[in-house]
Amino acid sequence: MATSELSCLVSEENCERREAFWAEWKDLTLSTRPEEGCSLHEEDTQRHETYHRQGQCQALVQRSPWLVMRMGILGRGLQEYQLPYQRVLPLPIFTPAKVGTKEEREETPIQLQELLALETALGGQCVDRQDVAEITKQLPPVVPVSKPGTLRRSLSRSMSQEAQRG
């Protein structure tokens, strides 16, 4: 099934008002597909020959950013469809559970109130905070890594090759 696509890119910039608009969409898709109800199949059992032919049609789909889609078979006319409005995100990012006045809202749970009070008392500081120098004193000393080429071999080259061969 062969498919050809045509994309559109529109960009506009207004430097005075510091505005920009940019849109890109797949505008036209032309695909070749088998045509329904248009196939021929012949079979000759004496000569052991078969012949099969499938009709093909070119399906055309045109989309636009204005939520209009046209589709149909090339040469037979296109049917136009108005697509329903769809949000960019599938769900709103934030929806309050209950919106109302302060009196109607439920009180904050006690555990959450205590946690919030503790965070405000600490002011974002860790009680057990240590300086980096104190932490590095507790670590073992750093040993420089030797270069791989300077390692001494315990076996000669011929011995190590024999060990690899088994």
Swiss-Prot record:
Phosphoserine modifications at: 39
Main subcellular localisation: cytoplasm
Position of the signal peptide: none
Annotated localization: Cytoplasm, Myofibril, Sarcomere
GO BP: cardiac muscle contraction; cardiac muscle tissue morphogenesis; cardiac myofibril assembly; detection of muscle stretch; sarcomerogenesis; skeletal muscle contraction; skeletal muscle myosin thick filament assembly; skeletal muscle thin filament assembly
Domain of life: Eukaryota
MF annotations from Gene Ontology: protein-macromolecule adaptor activity; structural constituent of muscle; titin binding
Cited InterPro entries: Telethonin, Titin-like_dom_sf
Disulfide bonds: none
Bias (Polar residues) ranges: 156-166
Cellular component per GO, a single term: Z disc
General function of this protein: Muscle assembly regulating factor. Mediates the antiparallel assembly of titin (TTN) molecules at the sarcomeric Z-disk.
Assembly, per entry: Interacts with MYOZ1, MYOZ2 and MYOZ3. Interacts with CSRP3. Interacts directly with the N-terminal Ig-like domains of 2 titin (TTN) molecules. Interacts with ANKRD2; the interaction is direct.
Name under which the protein is recorded: Telethonin
Lineage: Eukaryota, Metazoa, Chordata, Craniata, Vertebrata
Gene: TCAP
